[in-house]
Amino acid sequence: MDLLYTTVRKGNANTFSFTETQHNFEFLCNTSSCNVLAFTTTNELTEPSPIQGWGFHIYVVDLNAPWFPYRVTSNKYPISVLQWDVLGRYLLVGDRNGHVQIFVQKDNLLSEWKSVYSVKFPGENIIAAAFFHNGRKLNLQTDKKDQYLYLEKFQKVKFAASVRQFGGVPVEGVLIVSATGMLGAFVIPPESNANIQKLSEPIKLVPVTESLAVTRNYYTTADICYGKNGYFRVAVGNGDSKSANSNMIQCFRVAVKQREETLEINSTALPSFFLAEGMGKDLKELRVAHVQWVFSEDADSLIVASNHTGGGCFVEQWELTEESTPIHKLFQSNKNEPFKTLLWVSKSQYMYTSKVIKICTTKLNFLSSSFVYLAMSDNSIHCLQRDTLKRLTCTNIVSIRDPNDHSSKQIKLGLKIGAIDVTHLGHLFVTLDTFGQLYVYRCNFMCQDQLGTPALIVQTVNLLEYCLVTGLDSLDILLTLKTQILENVLERLTENFHRQPPNVQQYYYVNFLTMKIALYRLSISGQQKAHDLSNLLILHSILIAFKSLLRPSDLTSHDKGPAENLAMVLSESVPDVDKVLLNVEAKEFTMERPTLQSLQQLIQWVADLALNILAKLPESRSFMSNKSQGYDISKDIIALNSIRELLVMIRIWGLLNPQCLPVFSRSADNLDILGTLFRLLTKLSLNPNEPDDLLLDECCLLPNQVLIPQLQYVPSRTMIASPLLPHVTLPVMCDYGVENESLKFCPEVPIVEGGLSNDNVIDSVMYLQLGRRPPSLRRCTRCGSCSSVVSVAKTAAMKAWEQRWIDKCRCNGFWRLEVA
């Protein structure tokens, strides 16, 4: 385990003398599938002293920008449960007074949160919660990991949804367990995100309750996992020293059904066991501290962490097995088959001299590197192998600062580990201390060192493809990727994608481009390739948006639409755009004038892209070898033909409404820039790898005929997944509220001869100029792109375009509010 970075609060040496560990408050942290960490603190992170701003606060932070924490809420009672849904959209918060709230991002900003649903279980201490399973599960087949087809490599697992309504549609909802042995469940209304954003106050939902056991009992720890048949499995324990059942673990099977407009909960007892029956029977006064299912889906194994009076801990793995039990022949219904029963069997154990504070496990069960993590009272972190509980590594959060640092940055002895968690893909391990400070470790190098380079490339590509297919965020893979295999990973990822069937390629095309952009941005030399791929992604989105506006003039023609007819005409490579217009049906491209006017900024971007490709062509062919690796948009025939299709549409629309045409600063008024661009792109598309000298000469003259606008470049970005990360000393020391300057990367902007530069901030969604210093904007936490907070879309076409990026940036990053 390598410490990647730490994020600490600003302060001086005197303010850290207050110790929070004397209070019996539980600290929690949970990582979503989008690699956003939610965590609790008892002080505001913006205050220099832990004593100031005392309360029960919840913060979220993007693991790629850990210096910007955003407060979700401040609670009146201690927080006892913190849980994300599978998509990372809902954040569930439960407290010791029985109040459960569900938060979502306000206005789709990571920096703003609002409570949308509220449920009350008066007086109940919520100790566990789980969202209903949606029945969708995809596994990587380890025996087919060398296959290139996604449909063979990734198999859908037969898994039933937790609650289903009419037609088998999964229901969204939550199951909770309280300390008094109460089960509670409620349904989340199927509201759209737009309707949720309009709520001024949270909707109060009505829950259904039931007893977990026949009689209500007191429990101190609980965990919930999903069964493949749609039920839940609940494991509970009571670590109270005054209880007679302090070393007993009880398990239940819970089924939640929807009956008309209400829910019905049924709880059935499963075999239970005592810790004295296991390998720790010789230890005195074992008290259950934590129970944890090995996996959250269809688990038969349970990790039980206990503390004993000697000051140490005992961790044991129990497995539910089916064993034959001998019975008298008079009681056998079938004499040919033995009578079988379910029993818990102790499989492995681990002992340590300090008490265990927290426990967590890796979340995916098909990974070869599946671990159990333990946080101890002596601030040590232990990583155990899942099956044998053999210790693989051990580290400590104390003394990680440089001894030459200022005293305000030194770790104080009063710090204790508060909570731990691991990301969904298991590559990053997060530790939260009692002052709300973060310690993020890279933990996949333990298995990387054991693999050869070819096997490591295959494993990395498989995980990236799993993210591509499932939609999981791949940030933790990017942060642990070795730079020396980056090119090989990109090559294999691209090769595998192009070997997929056409329908599969079309379905995952945007996800594939987004992933390649993120990979190229990890290296300093890959910035231009990432920029070209970003332009390709925008070009593809504009082409799809424009094609969706076309309507066939003859409704009886179902074979081909206007877009297909246009592509067929362009396949003949006619260089004159006006001759192309003679072969297309103009009525199929007819639209309202206001709609055409609203598309002007997107039309302008297409024209600017065409100008930049052609203006850079002579320089790129003279300084770069044709065998150079990586992506180059000027060599992409599909991209060039997409621009040609758009130029034909723009030409037709310009005849309907000249105000929608792109604006050029040309040397002579009689120059037909659109016609020239189409002609040159047609020539280039015939042989993009080796354009003839005549074409290069014409491209050299292009900056003399028209000013070339500079395409949008993010001037600088500061993030953990920076190209500078391999060149800085680890761990990276970060402070809350201050960007780390050592990771600030300013990409080299290629200057086009005769180009027109612009210092204004450009909206990355609407492609409007926002000025040099706009008062407020939303900025992406991953790529640094900016967009206006205020919607300017007036027509249905532009509103649909804006909705494409309303939730996230085109790089799949989160928007955050930035105020000047």
From Swiss-Prot:
InterPro entries: MED16_bridge, Mediator_Med16, Mediator_Med16_C, Mediator_Med16_N, WD40_repeat_dom_sf
Transcription regulation recorded as keyword: yes
Record bears the keyword Metal-binding: no
UniProt-annotated location(s): Nucleus
Keywords of the record: Activator, Nucleus, Repeat, Transcription, Transcription regulation, WD repeat
GO CC annotations on file: mediator complex
Pfam families in UniProt: Med16_bridge (PF20718), Med16_C (PF20719), Med16_N (PF11635)
GO biological process, one term: positive regulation of DNA-templated transcription
Superkingdom per UniProt: Eukaryota
Residues in WD repeats: 74-114, 621-665, 757-811
PANTHER family: MEDIATOR OF RNA POLYMERASE II TRANSCRIPTION SUBUNIT 16, THYROID HORMONE RECEPTOR-ASSOCIATED PROTEIN-RELATED
Subunit note: Component of the Mediator complex.
Family the UniProt entry places it in: Belongs to the Mediator complex subunit 16 family.
Physiological role: Component of the Mediator complex, a coactivator involved in the regulated transcription of nearly all RNA polymerase II-dependent genes. Mediator functions as a bridge to convey information from gene-specific regulatory proteins to the basal RNA polymerase II transcription machinery. Mediator is recruited to promoters by direct interactions with regulatory proteins and serves as a scaffold for the assembly of a functional preinitiation complex with RNA polymerase II and the general transcription factors.
Name recorded for this polypeptide: Mediator of RNA polymerase II transcription subunit 16
Top-level taxonomy: Eukaryota, Metazoa, Ecdysozoa, Arthropoda, Hexapoda
Gene that this polypeptide is encoded by: MED16
